[in-house]
């Protein structure tokens, strides 16, 4: 009997921790120029391009792989905010070796739900799409935030339209098919070549 009561005390403690018990969904993807390890990937909740304290982040490993757990709120935000990669000096590009100059790559928000089965590829091509969104946007993107986009359907639709237009521009300008914009082009190239 006493073991049983001990067990219930234990579970009482667990629920007492509050936040950490909130279930999380793991999302994953790849950082690609060549595959880059040692880069910091974060969910840019306030669109400022800087990893803030409250923003979920992780570091990419071999083959550019990254994954992190998101709370339900963060997961919802992931559909509406960019995923940013800070590639620092000293990160390793599987194709070109050690990175000597820091740079950033960005995956624009897709405006559709993200699930743990999605692979989010962040590359110079996805960054082009994001840069195009910034260029096309009538107001500075920096004025957006996850809360603002979720709360404001007009803002959401306007930004989703910007994404569509940016994709179209990049497709036309660089002669890349739309489905190739967000893929792992290294893996595809390798299968195509070999």
Task: Give the ranges of each region predicted by the language model.
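Feature for extracytoplasmic/surface-facing segments of secreted or surface-associated proteins
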Residues: 1-194
């Amino acid at each position: 009997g006493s073991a049983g009561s001990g067990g219930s005390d234990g579970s009482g403690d667990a629920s007492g921790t509050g936040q950490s018990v909130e279930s999380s969904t793991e999302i994953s993807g790849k950082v690609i120029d060549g595959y880059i390890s040692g880069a910091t990937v974060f969910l840019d909740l306030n669109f400022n391009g800087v990893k803030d304290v409250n923003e979920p982040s992780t570091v990419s490993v071999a083959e550019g792989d990254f994954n992190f757990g998101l709370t339900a709120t963060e997961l919802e935000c992931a559909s509406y905010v960019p995923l940013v990669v800070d590639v620092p000096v000293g990160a390793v590009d599987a194709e070109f070796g050690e990175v000597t100059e820091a740079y950033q790559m960005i995956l624009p928000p897709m405006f559709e739900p993200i699930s743990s089965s999605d692979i989010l590829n962040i590359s110079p091509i996805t960054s082009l799409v994001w840069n195009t969104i910034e260029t096309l946007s009538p107001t500075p993107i920096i004025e957006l935030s996850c809360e603002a986009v979720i709360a404001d359907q007009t803002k959401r639709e306007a930004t989703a339209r910007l994404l569509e237009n940016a994709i179209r521009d990049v497709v036309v300008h660089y002669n890349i098919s739309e489905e190739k914009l967000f893929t792992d082009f290294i893996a595809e190239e390798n299968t195509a070549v070999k």
